[in-house]
Amino acid sequence: MLGSTGSIGTQTLQIAEEFPEQFRVVALTAGQNLDLLVQQIQRHQPELVALANADLLPELQQRLDALGTDRKRPQLVGGPDGLNIAASWESADLVVTGIVGCAGLLPTLAAVRAGKDLALANKETLIAAGPVVLPELKKSGSRLLPADSEHSAIFQCLQGTPWAENARLSTGVPTPGLRRIQLTASGGAFRDWKAEDLENATVADATSHPNWSMGRKITVDSASLMNKGLEVIEAHYLFGLDYDHIEIVIHPQSIIHSMIELADSSVLAQLGWPDMKLPILYCLSWPSRLETPWRRLDLTEVGQLSFRAPDPAKYPCMQLAYAAGRAGGTMPAVMNAANEEAVAQFLEEKIHFLDIPVVIEAACERHKADLIAHPQLEDVLAVDQWARMAVREQVKRGTTRVPLAALAA
């Protein structure tokens, strides 16, 4: 479990506890939440624990020593190399990647190169490094199983088609018979706000999601619809469709998690309550399904399902993501890194919510002349660092916000 103390990690470990006959946790990685990590170590008794911050290893060792149990202690490793060791741990059959942002890229690649199957909750890995990751998947035979709700929904819908064998998510080639993907979006924290009212948006407003329980960064991405834009790029890499055939639909109830249209014009959808444990469980149990006592969907309780097209004037980040995806090469990596840095600056209240698309667009514009069409890993890592620095520099200079209508034009 990469990122065991985060939102995806804690929910994955809850599932492992619910199904002890099916799943055993062999390795955990975490950032710096030692309190929760120690509890997880006690509960799951992994063989290996990796800390992203190697400086915290002595403190973790002391805390484990203080427990004074007779149980076998896990091996402790730290830093980037430690994360890679955990990601390629020999006794692991499946690696769940829940590390937020581009920090998850190198451990994910380590897992792929070790031939591990992956439950991918870290969408930034494919977005920033799709041209690097997909050939590695083909080489190693690893399978990529999407752990976020939308791509899991698409994957599940494809299981009911004659092309299920092609939907292995390991090549990025077009899925035969798949005509269109419709990614559903809740609309995020500002779905019922008027575009002009976003001038008054605060960090507290942007981090209050109406439907899903998620981490702060992804909740802000949901509010800007950048999250859905990133998912468009991810869907392009996973299922091989071009951007003209991947659409975003606002669906406030978050009951339909995504839809696919097939060659005969029929549409398949996957439904369920908005609960991340459902797609995570499917990744862990695929191709089987495990019986759960979880709350069952009652459509009469839901009452109605509604849909509308997203307003480009209100969600400029969505347009930026489509543009970066179509540009290809290193542009998605630049856009993703610029967004990560912009959101971090917003959460620290150094910029306004409406500055987020402005600084992202500026970084993407600056990168156009230097775009690398067929990047190597080193190129992706280099432009990632460059884009973060470009955003920080712009924030220091001060942002010049432009009207929303101008951004959408």
UniProtKB/Swiss-Prot annotation:
Which InterPro entries does this one have? DXP_reductoisomerase, DXP_reductoisomerase_C, DXP_reductoisomerase_N, DXPR_C, DXPR_C_sf, NAD(P)-bd_dom_sf
> Which Pfam families does its entry note?
DXP_redisom_C, DXP_reductoisom, DXPR_C
Q: Which UniProt keywords apply?
A: Isoprene biosynthesis, Manganese, Metal-binding, NADP, Oxidoreductase
**EC numbers on record:** 1.1.1.267
Whether Manganese counts among this entry's keywords is: yes
UniProt binding sites for Mn(2+): 148, 150, 231
Protein origin, superkingdom: Bacteria
Question: At which positions is 1-deoxy-D-xylulose 5-phosphate bound?
Answer: 123, 149-150, 186, 209, 222, 227-228, 231
User: What pathway is it annotated to?
Assistant: Isoprenoid biosynthesis; isopentenyl diphosphate biosynthesis via DXP pathway; isopentenyl diphosphate from 1-deoxy-D-xylulose 5-phosphate: step 1/6
Cofactors: Mg(2+); Mn(2+)
What is one GO biological process annotated to this record? isopentenyl diphosphate biosynthetic process, methylerythritol 4-phosphate pathway involved in terpenoid biosynthetic process
Provide the catalytic activity annotation.
Answer: 2-C-methyl-D-erythritol 4-phosphate + NADP(+) = 1-deoxy-D-xylulose 5-phosphate + NADPH + H(+)
Chain positions recorded as NADPH binding sites: 5-8, 31, 33, 122, 124, 215
Q: Which GO terms describe its molecular function?
A: 1-deoxy-D-xylulose-5-phosphate reductoisomerase activity; manganese ion binding; NADPH binding
NCBIfam families, per the entry: Dxr (TIGR00243), PRK12464.1 (NF009114)
**Similarity comment: family membership:** Belongs to the DXR family.
Task: State the protein's purpose.
Answer: Catalyzes the NADPH-dependent rearrangement and reduction of 1-deoxy-D-xylulose-5-phosphate (DXP) to 2-C-methyl-D-erythritol 4-phosphate (MEP).
Full protein name: 1-deoxy-D-xylulose 5-phosphate reductoisomerase
List the source organism. Parasynechococcus marenigrum (strain WH8102)
Q: Recall the taxonomic lineage recorded for the source organism.
A: Bacteria, Bacillati, Cyanobacteriota, Cyanophyceae, Synechococcales
